[in-house]
């Protein structure tokens, strides 16, 4: 995996939270970006469970697909109160100028006593958004509004 085997790392940002996610494949960078985002909200190491939600989305480009993917997971957390810890992207494809993702996120019901809340994320932003293929895989830079 790129960057010495790291899945993600957090970077300095004045007001919000910025992270880089890495992956050998495009699917893996989407999975690791989701993990990085949820580790801002809670400690995913304390989450288990196999409550699953399927996510299928279509967007005009890969960068928008990444933002839509993370935003949908954030929405599911807020509405269904599920904390996710495992992400499996089954497919990302381009067809007729649009990109789509089919994935499954797994986790468990959110209980404040079991999952201490660390940071509230208001939104996933396009600010400083980057998604690029590198010599050794893929890299995504994401800023979330807190």
UniProtKB/Swiss-Prot annotation:
GO term, biological process aspect, one: tRNA splicing, via endonucleolytic cleavage and ligation
GO function terms (MF aspect): calcium ion binding
Pfam families reported in the protein's UniProt record: Archease
Protein residues bound to Ca(2+): 16, 145-146
Keywords, sorted A to Z: Calcium, Metal-binding, tRNA processing
Domain of life assignment: Archaea
Family listed: Belongs to the archease family.
HAMAP family: Archease_arch
Biological function: Activates the tRNA-splicing ligase complex by facilitating the enzymatic turnover of catalytic subunit RtcB. Acts by promoting the guanylylation of RtcB, a key intermediate step in tRNA ligation. Can also alter the NTP specificity of RtcB such that ATP, dGTP or ITP is used efficiently.
Record's protein name: Protein archease
Organism: Methanosarcina acetivorans (strain ATCC 35395 / DSM 2834 / JCM 12185 / C2A)
């Amino acid at each position: 995996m790129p960057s010495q085997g790291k899945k993600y790392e957090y970077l300095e940002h004045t007001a919000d939270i910025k992270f880089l996610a890495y992956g050998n494949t495009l699917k893996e960078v989407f999975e690791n970006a989701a993990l990085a985002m949820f580790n801002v909200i809670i400690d995913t190491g304390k989450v288990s469970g196999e409550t699953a939600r399927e996510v299928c989305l279509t967007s005009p480009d890969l960068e928008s697909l990444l933002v839509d993917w993370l935003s949908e997971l954030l929405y599911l957390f807020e509405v269904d109160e599920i904390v996710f810890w495992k992400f499996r992207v089954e497919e990302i494809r381009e067809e007729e100028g649009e990109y789509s993702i089919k994935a499954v996120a797994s986790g468990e019901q959110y209980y404040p006593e079991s999952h201490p809340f660390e940071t509230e994320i208001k939104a996933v932003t396009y600010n400083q958004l980057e998604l690029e293929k590198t010599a050794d895989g893929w890299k995504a830079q994401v800023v979330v509004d807190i």
